[in-house]
């Protein structure tokens, strides 16, 4: 399943979880829901329409766990989700290259001062994939350009 195809769904809300939930909480919510909607757990006298809804919900829950239950796919999903949120917030104020940003050895991140006095910050790991970075003090956004 391609991650791009699944970004339209909010996998956290499908599991009834907060995006800041840890892996243990996500697993607990998944297990609770999967038991509730598992086709084998439904009674035989459930109407066909309801059974189909339960099956669809079961599939969605399983898909959510396949993405959120794996550290690598969860990280990619979270990053893309964050970028989508930024894209919906407002227009890009500027385009910058990583070389234009300063290095913070303390927390191993790159940063750039914003005209409001705040900072655009991106971790070393996120810098490889991130394209949009929001200011920590205002609504401005910069686009991080990657070398081609």
Curated annotation (Swiss-Prot):
Disruption phenotype: High embryonic lethality at 14.5 dpc. As early as 10.5 dpc, embryos are smaller than their wild-type littermates. Embryos that survive long enough to initiate digit formation show one or more additional preaxial digits. Signal peptide: none annotated. Zn(2+) binds at residues 114, 116, 135, 138. GO terms for molecular function: ATPase activator activity; ferrous iron binding; zinc ion binding. CDD domains: DnaJ (cd06257). This is DnaJ homolog subfamily C member 24. Residues 10-81 form the J domain. Monomer and homooligomer. Iron binding promotes oligomerization. Belongs to the DPH4 family. Residues 92-147 form the DPH-type MB domain. SUPFAM superfamilies: Chaperone J-domain, CSL zinc finger. Detected in heart, brain, spleen, lung, liver, kidney and testis. One of its GO terms (biological process) is positive regulation of ATP-dependent activity. GO terms for cellular component: actin cytoskeleton; cytoplasm. It is found in: Cytoplasm, Cytoskeleton. Its main location: cytoplasm. It comes from Mus musculus. Keywords: Cytoplasm, Cytoskeleton, Electron transport, Iron, Metal-binding, Transport, Zinc. The gene is Dnajc24.
């Amino acid at each position: 399943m391609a991650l791009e195809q699944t970004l339209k769904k909010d996998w956290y809300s499908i599991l009834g979880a907060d995006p800041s939930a840890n892996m243990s909480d996500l697993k607990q919510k998944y297990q609770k829901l999967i038991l509730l909607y598992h086709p084998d757990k439904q009674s035989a006298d459930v109407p066909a329409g309801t059974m189909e809804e339960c099956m669809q919900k079961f599939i969605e829950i399983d898909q959510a766990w396949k993405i959120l239950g794996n550290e690598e796919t969860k990280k990619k999903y979270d990053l893309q989700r964050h970028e989508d949120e930024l894209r919906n917030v407002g227009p890009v104020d500027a385009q910058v290259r990583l070389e234009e940003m300063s290095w913070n050895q303390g927390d191993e991140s790159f940063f750039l001062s914003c005209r409001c006095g705040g900072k655009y910050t991106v971790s070393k790991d996120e810098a490889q994939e991130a394209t949009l970075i929001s200011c920590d003090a205002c609504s401005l956004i910069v686009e991080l350009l990657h070398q081609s």
